[in-house]
Amino acid sequence: KELYGITTIMNYSGMEEMMKVQAVTDVGRERSVNQDYVYYSLTETGSLPNLFLVADGMGGHKAGDMASRYTVETFVSLVQDSTLKDPVSIINNAVTQVNRRLLQKAAESEDYEGMGTTLVAATVYDNILRVANVGDSRLYILGNEITQITRDHSLVEEMVSMGEINREQTRNHEKKNIITRAIGG
């Protein structure tokens, strides 16, 4: 199984010289296990000057917590070992490879069958933000205002794009948690 349209790469010029990073995860009200996994480094990771990752295991599927942890740890390893120099190529390659590896891992055991996760990967290289996202985890930039950078890969986002519902209706829509792309799954 290959990802279709695996990434959305965006250039966001004018990043501040000084970045502040904060990561907070929360198990939420409906789950007993936190399926979020976060990694960030403000120093070099492989050929990238910095790296930011967020993965959220797919709730309702097996081993979502394992899928998010495995995805982030494997992604970091792939970036560290990459011989590529272009940041977009490095990120694209890591997304493709981590998807393949997670699918292989899922095939090893019934306990992992169907496991998957969302992923946001970002780096600031030459003062330009490069972002890849799969699923409905989001990247925001905080400045004078909060700006959502990524576009959700979800059924309700597609419905908004086609004019079937408006943005406000997505909040309580019965299909709001159906994603159209994932790592693994």
Regions inferred by a protein language model and the residue ranges of each:
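PP2C/PPM-type serine/threonine phosphatase catalytic domain
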Residues: 2-185
